[in-house]
């Protein structure tokens, strides 16, 4: 399950999305809602989310400022913007901060579910790659003593060139 934070200054929008989205079926857990970006930042500094759904126009800290903050401070958090503004500048900024999707209001539950499904596939892929890298790193670390031993044997037997020695010294 991926944790989602919903950020929108309109209570009706927060309520509609919260209640009409089948979070668990889609592989998500709604960790909460916030009415502006400032509240979201405070929440995200306390508890990590995997995905933030945010509006753009909100008081105090708007959705673009929130997106920039997440891009700079919480690199792993993905963002979907749900906005009533069809402005090219917003879209350009969203691309700059690697927003996963930019959805225009009004949005149906079906459209949101399709978007969440696509994003979940990307999140699953990233999670798999991280776990695969972790597994490979673990295997390398457990075999490192053997690799060092083989290298030492090669050194003692004189089977290693100067350049290979330099490369192996960096690795081991």
Regions found by a protein language model. Give the residues of each.
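Acidic catalytic/metal-coordinating carboxylates
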Residues: 36-39, 62-65, 83
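Acidic, metal-coordinating helix/loop segments flanking the phosphotransfer/catalytic sites
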Residues: 33-51
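Interdomain helical linkers/hinges and coiled-coil/dimerization scaffolds
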Residues: 107-172
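Receiver (REC) domain active-site loop signature in two-component systems and cognate sites
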Residues: 58
